[in-house]
C-alpha cells in the first residue's frame, strides 16, 4: 500500500516493477509473497478513483476494488509478473469472499500472462496464486476456495473483526476484540481442516501469529506456517521447538463450543508449559 499513499499520481507499471524486482533479487533464493493492494476506495479518492465511505471496512476495498478497477489491478499484476523473472515470487489476493472472487482474479492474471508472453517479456509462468482467508464466508468456504488457490493465508486481524463485528481501533468496543473467541478459533480450525483435505499450504498472519500466548494454540490447531513480526522471531521459534505431539491432542480434545473464559483456562493452564519458556 505504501506505493499508493502520499502520492499525487498512481504508480506506473515501471515504478512498481523496479520495486518488486529489487525485493525479488535481494531475497533470492527465498520466496517473497506480494499481496495485491488492500486499500479502500476512500484512500484513493485523491486519484479520483473512490470516495469517502461511512464504513470502509465493509466497503469497496481489497480485491473487490481491484476487480472494479481492472486497469490498476492489471498494472500491478504485470509489474509483479515481470519481477518474477528475477526471483521467487508469490501473489496473494486480499479480501476474498469466495472461490468466484478468486476465479475472476485468476482470469485477469492469466490475461496478463498472455500479454507478456505475446510481447516476449520474461516471467515465471508457474508463479503461485494465494487467497487471504479473513472473511467468515471465505473461512466457511475454504474447501471450495482451496480447489482454486495454490496456497492460503489466514489473516487473523480482519477475521476477528469481521467475525465479531468489532473495530479493534474503536475504544468503545475494543473489549469485544477477542482473538481467542471460540467462534474465531472454530473458523480457523475449519480452514485448517479444509486445507489439509485439499492438500493446499496454509499459513497464519496477523497479531495472533506473533503472540506467544497464541502460538501453541495455532500449532495445536494444525498450523505449520506463521508470518510473524521480526521482533518476535526468536521467541516464537523457541515456543515452536517446545511443542510436541501431546499439544495437538490437547487441542483436538478441546470443545470449542464453549465460552471465552474456558478458552482462556485452556491457554493459561494446559498450554502454559509451551509458551512459558
Task: For every predicted segment, state its role.
Residues 1-277:
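Conserved alpha/beta-domain cores
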Amino acid at each position: 500500500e505504501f506505493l499508493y499513499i502520499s502520492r499525487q499520481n498512481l504508480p506506473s507499471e515501471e515504478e512498481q516493477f523496479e520495486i518488486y524486482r529489487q525485493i525479488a533479487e535481494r531475497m533470492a533464493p527465498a520466496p517473497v509473497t506480494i499481496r495485491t493492494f488492500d486499500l479502500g476506495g476512500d484512500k484513493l479518492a485523491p486519484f479520483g478513483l473512490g470516495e469517502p465511505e461511512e464504513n470502509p471496512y465493509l466497503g469497496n476495498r481489497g480485491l473487490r476494488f481491484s476487480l472494479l478497477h481492472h486497469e490498476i489491478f492489471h498494472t500491478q499484476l504485470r509489474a509483479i509478473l515481470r519481477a518474477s523473472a528475477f526471483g521467487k515470487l508469490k501473489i496473494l489476493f486480499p479480501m476474498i469472499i469466495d472461490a468466484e472472487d478468486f476465479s475472476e482474479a485468476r482470469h485477469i492474471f492469466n490475461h496478463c500472462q498472455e500479454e507478456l508472453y505475446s510481447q516476449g517479456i520474461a516471467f515465471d509462468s508457474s508463479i503461485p496464486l494465494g487467497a487471504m482467508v479473513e472473511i467468515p464466508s471465505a473461512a466457511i468456504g475454504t474447501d471450495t476456495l482451496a480447489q482454486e488457490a495454490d496456497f492460503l493465508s489466514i489473516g487473523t486481524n480482519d477475521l476477528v473483526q469481521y467475525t465479531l463485528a468489532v473495530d479493534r481501533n474503536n475504544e468503545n468496543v475494543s473489549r469485544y476484540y477477542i482473538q481467542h473467541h471460540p467462534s474465531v478459533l472454530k473458523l480457523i480450525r475449519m480452514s485448517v481442516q479444509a486445507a489439509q483435505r485439499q492438500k493446499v499450504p496454509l499459513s497464519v498472519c496477523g497479531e495472533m501469529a506473533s503472540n506467544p500466548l497464541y502460538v501453541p494454540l495455532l500449532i495445536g490447531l494444525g498450523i505449520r506456517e506463521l508470518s510473524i513480526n521480526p521482533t518476535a522471531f526468536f521467541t516464537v521459534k523457541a515456543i515452536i521447538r517446545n511443542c510436541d505431539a501431546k499439544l495437538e491432542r490437547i487441542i483436538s480434545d478441546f470443545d470449542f463450543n464453549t465460552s471465552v473464559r474456558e478458552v482462556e483456562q485452556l491457554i493459561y493452564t494446559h498450554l502454559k508449559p509451551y509458551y512459558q519458556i
